[in-house]
């Protein structure tokens, strides 16, 4: 169960995912190809066409952006230390991202 959790939780954190078990590395790498095109050049063109024919992207970029921006709007505190912050800054009007320096400064301690 821990392996599955790690693969899901770390798939957007290459600085950690690439140093974990092979399954975690593969989940991260597969998602990186699918979402960002990282490593796409290592897949032959005929294979790419076959894959995209079987699994069309169906406006993936637009839909993905919309989903992430909805999370930013509904749960802005979940944007600390992940890709949601970037989408909020770029696409969500009025988004004021949580900032770690502010979190420390506003911690409930007297000193």
Can you say where each PLM-predicted feature lies in the sequence?
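Divalent metal-dependent phosphate-bond-processing catalytic cores, especially two-metal-ion Mg2+/Mn2+ enzymes
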Residues: 13-111
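Histidine- and acidic-residue-rich, metal-dependent catalytic cores
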Residues: 1-16
């Amino acid at each position: 169960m821990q392996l599955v959790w790690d693969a899901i939780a770390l798939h957007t954190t290459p600085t950690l995912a690439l140093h974990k078990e092979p399954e975690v590395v593969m989940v991260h790498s597969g998602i990186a190809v699918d979402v960002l095109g990282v490593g796409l050049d290592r897949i032959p063109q005929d294979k790419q066409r076959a894959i995209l024919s079987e699994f069309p992207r169906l406006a993936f970029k637009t839909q993905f952006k919309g989903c992430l921006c909805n999370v930013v709007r509904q749960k802005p505190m979940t944007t600390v230390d992940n890709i949601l912050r970037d989408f909020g800054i770029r696409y969500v009007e009025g988004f004021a991202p949580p900032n770690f320096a502010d979190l420390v400064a506003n911690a409930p301690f007297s000193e």
